[in-house]
Swiss-Prot record:
Belongs to the class I-like SAM-binding methyltransferase superfamily. CmoB family. Gene3D superfamilies: Vaccinia Virus protein VP39. Its EC number is 2.5.1.-. This is tRNA U34 carboxymethyltransferase.
Length: 323
């Protein structure tokens, strides 16, 4: 059973304590009414994993845990089998005692692009919106964060996160809650807020930016990573039925237009930190994610276009500050 009591106890003692006015009731409602049909199967996989305290833990350069003595073949097979019960693994990679989860996305590449542009994360309380399996939460802890909180309503991601946490010695510095951003009150409590790979899925992108701003302390930093297109500050692509085979893509602005949106929401010191083409080396099918991936979503004769004829995925990182 996945429980949230440790998180409640943790925030009861800090500046997130006011969240407890609504959070336990939201989680209780989720447990009672909203659990996925496969959730018990996934949570059983987590329960059957051994809780191991790593002899060596590297969260600075990767998410890697090692034991002092190699695990037995039987132990490794058990861990491998249980983790495969949580497929597909989209965000990673993870190296856990010799079990290497080669995820669809090389999320470590994204982190290496983003990290040089961030304010020092040492001692910070961080929110990661749409955090997936929580890979970047662990990298934030590795970069010195005091507490990293992720929210993502996808319940498989919650189970993947809890599986990794258990294999990292039940580390309590990172937490994932099965919520969407619209379920959060204006907490105004996080030093840094990340939203990576979320904005283009929102029907109202400016509302999403306001929601992110409402989670920041004054002088807090927003890190926004999203799909963009080439163009000036007035350029926005509104795809038809699908973009790269995704149905739920609503608005893809240019990076200059996105900068303008952030400024319109009252954020300051907005800068375009990085713009990068997504390659089929960064997002691809693996043995841990065996269905279609980016190569299947691009025009087979012209990888500069999606199968629908739109510009191929281009991603930008923008950094802004709340005054």
């Amino acid at each position: 059973m996945i429980e949230f009591g440790n998180f409640y106890q943790l925030i009861a003692k800090n500046h997130l304590s006011h969240w407890l006015e609504i959070l336990p009731a939201q989680i209780a409602a989720w447990q009672r009414e909203q659990q996925h049909g496969l959730f018990k199967q996934w949570s059983n996989a987590v329960e059957f994993l051994p809780e191991i305290t790593p002899w060596r833990l590297d969260l600075l350069h990767s998410v890697t845990a090692e034991s002092e003595a190699p695990l037995s073949e039987g132990q490794l097979k058990r861990i491998d089998t249980l983790l495969r019960n949580l497929m597909p693994w989209r965000k990673g990679p993870f190296s856990l005692y010799g079990v290497n989860i080669d995820t669809e996305w090389r999320s470590d590449w994204k982190w290496e692009r983003v990290l040089p542009h961030l304010s020092d994360l040492t001692g910070r309380t961080i929110l990661d919106v749409g955090c997936g399996s929580g890979y970047h939460l662990w990298r934030m802890i590795g970069a010195g964060a005091h507490l990293a909180v992720g929210i993502d309503p996808t319940q498989l991601f919650l189970c993947q996160f809890e599986a990794v946490r258990k294999l990292l010695g039940n580390d309590q510095r990172a937490h994932l809650l099965p919520l969407g951003i619209e379920q959060l009150p204006a907490l105004k409590a996080f030093d840094t807020v990340f939203s990576m790979g979320v904005l283009y899925h929102r029907r109202s992108p400016l509302e999403h930016l306001w929601q992110l701003k409402d989670q920041l302390v004054n002088e807090g930093e927003l890190v926004l990573e999203t799909l963009v297109v080439d163009g000036d500050e007035n350029t926005v692509l509104v795809p038809g039925d699908r973009y790269a085979q995704m149905r739920n893509v609503y608005f893809i602005p240019s990076a200059p237009a996105l900068k303008k949106w952030l400024e319109k929401c009252g954020l300051i010191d907005v800068r375009i930190a990085d713009v990068c083409v997504t390659t089929t080396e960064e997002q691809r099918r693996t043995e841990w994610m065996v269905t279609e991936s980016l190569a299947d979503f691009l025009d087979p004769n012209d990888h500069s276009k999606t199968v629908e004829g739109y510009p191929a995925p281009l991603r930008a990182v923008l950094i802004a500050r709340k005054p």
